[in-house]
Structure formats: structure tokens, C-alpha cells
């Protein structure tokens, strides 16, 4: 996955081929498997930003998060329906079943307070929409975010969730092209 126009990739993070591992060290209570995958991918991108020193961001209050996931918390919603029908549900499952939890968990765990959005659509269809939103949040005269974690989440054939996070920042301005010929002097005369 590449950066949208006007943006640069500052870091990448992803779950491993067997699903999330790193995120399970964060105390979050009952969570949907998609939440674990997103939390893991965002944590990996943050670690890359910090040079492997652990998740850190200077000012998370202006960091936006966009997650694209077709399923979101569907697994927990289905489990909640089954448990409710049998009379043995846990109130914690209601929190874990909210689709916004997929985005909100990473925001809470890592202190990210910029704009956030969950696009419930297949990643291949949602990526262009998410990329355009990230570009708009990062650009213009009054940017809404200093960085955007753009996360694509999907279910692997083995059943676990995989997520990839691109940590996007505004692209640096183009360097000014020198129009002056280095073989000419300031006054336009040929140098010897």
C-alpha cells in the first residue's frame, strides 16, 4: 500500500501472518479480534516511529485514525446475539461489540485524539476513500491532523484478522528547482 498524493509514509505496522500478538500486552478488557489486529498494527507503526523504543508519539492529540474493515466487530456481535439468546451474556460484550471500538481502542490505548473514522467496507474498495480523507485531514491551510494512522483490516483465510497500518504525514513541499546555470556568474557572464 502506498501513500496518497500529498502524503508521505512515516512508518508502517502490521500484524504478523498468525494474527495479532503485541497488542495483548495492553490492558483493554474484552475486545473483538478485529480490535486486537488494529491495535497491534498501530502499535507496530508507533514502534517504528520511535525507532523500536516502544509505542510513542510526541503529540497524539492531533493524530487521526481511519480504519477500513468490512467486518469490524461482527464476530463479537454474533457471539453477543448467541449469548443473549441463551441468557448468559456479559455486559462487557456490549462495549466490545460496538463497531467504533475498532477505532476507539487504538485511540485510547495510544493517546490519539485527532479525527477518527471507521469505514465498514472491503479494504480494496475503502482504501481510496480513506486515502482521500487522510489527504484532506493533513492538507490545506488549516490541517485537521498532524498525522493519520490509516489501517486496512481483513480476515485471513485461517480465520484470524490481519491489519496493516500506514502512518501518514503531510508530504514535504517540493524543493525549489534552481534555474541558475552553475557555469554562469551572477551577472550572466561565462566563467573561465
Locate each region found by the language model.
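Conserved "HGTGT" condensation-loop signature of ketosynthase/thiolase-family condensing enzymes
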Residues: 1-192
Amino acid at each position: 500500500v502506498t501513500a496518497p498524493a500529498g502524503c508521505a509514509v512515516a512508518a508502517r505496522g502490521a500484524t504478523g501472518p498468525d494474527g495479532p500478538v503485541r497488542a495483548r500486552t495492553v490492558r483493554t478488557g474484552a475486545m473483538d479480534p478485529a480490535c486486537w489486529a488494529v491495535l497491534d498494527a498501530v502499535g507496530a507503526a508507533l514502534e517504528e516511529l520511535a525507532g523500536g523504543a516502544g509505542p510513542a508519539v510526541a503529540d497524539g492529540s492531533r493524530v487521526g485514525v481511519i480504519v477500513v474493515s468490512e467486518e469490524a466487530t461482527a464476530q463479537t456481535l454474533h457471539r453477543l446475539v448467541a449469548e443473549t439468546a441463551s441468557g448468559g451474556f456479559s455486559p462487557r460484550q456490549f462495549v466490545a461489540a460496538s463497531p467504533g471500538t475498532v477505532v476507539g481502542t487504538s485511540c485510547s490505548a495510544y493517546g490519539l485524539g485527532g479525527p477518527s473514522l471507521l469505514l465498514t467496507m472491503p479494504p480494496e474498495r475503502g482504501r481510496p476513500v480513506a486515502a482521500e480523507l487522510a489527504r484532506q485531514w493533513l492538507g490545506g491551510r488549516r490541517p485537521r491532523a498532524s498525522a493519520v494512522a490509516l489501517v486496512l483490516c481483513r480476515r485471513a483465510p485461517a480465520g484470524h484478522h490481519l491489519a496493516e497500518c500506514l502512518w501518514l504525514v503531510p508530504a514535504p513541499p517540493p524543493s525549489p528547482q534552481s534555474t541558475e546555470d552553475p557555469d554562469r556568474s551572477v551577472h550572466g557572464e561565462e566563467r573561465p
